[in-house]
Amino acid sequence: MGSHRRTVITASTREIEVLTAGNPDGYPWLWIPGSPSAAADYPRLDDLATRLGLRIMTWSRPGYGDSSPRAMPAHGPRISDDIPDIETILDAEGVEEEFIVVGWSGGGPRALACAAMLPERCKAAATLASLAPFDAEGLDWMAGMGPGNVADFAAALEGPEAYGAFKETYFLPMTDASVDDVAAGLAMLLTPSDDVTHSLGLARWLTEMTHRAGVQGEIGARDDGLALVAPWGFDVTSIAVPVAIWAGGQDATVPLAHGKWLAANVPTAVPHLLEDAGHITLINDLEDVLRELLEIK
């Protein structure tokens, strides 16, 4: 039914860029894409939401797209810092009672934060290829990741200044790259099952998200990555909301071990550990993901 882009204002007067699509009167679905990314139109999601009677809400996290950066907290960025922004978005969109949430890749920890910190409103959550907490007990966090991701997270562990310089060097050149260039760059992080060139629409969407993620420079990508390797600000073992954990055995970006750890440590987990799935191909299961959430909420 088409998308609508708007700006909402936080209590601290920051601006948040919000994108909605699907059925405007449908059940609220919060969609949280990966890192780095910004709110971008994807007709496939719009069509899916319309068909399932859902209203999609997504946003550009601080420093991405047209969303104001967040001042660097003394403790550094944390995943839990996004919850007040999510509450602001829900209030602005008139979502007073309940919603479901799906987080993909770097969006997965935010979906888990919704389940942990907004249990009265978040009725069910799903993660697609989500990272586990960096301090996850018993998990070799970087084992099995592609070399690009290992280098990225290693730089994040060096702190904001070093990581900002890393992102300026390696991320910003991608923000004006062509669809073909983005697909080629992703290929270094992905496995054969994740070949994005088979779907021009998907590659265009990923390219637009990447372009818009860098319109303010590297600050959004820097803070996003720092939050992933810092304490998240909540305990996944305290979650009481149903959470579907989707992860793929062919994922070289977020290895299957992360999904297995979440499935074993989120008390309400409903595991979907797919040996043949990759990081990108889990998007193909999104209809099944949403139908399950609507059943278990």
Indicate residue ranges for each PLM-predicted region:
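Conserved alpha/beta-hydrolase
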Residues: A49-P69
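Conserved acidic catalytic loop of the alpha/beta-hydrolase fold
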Residues: D81-F99
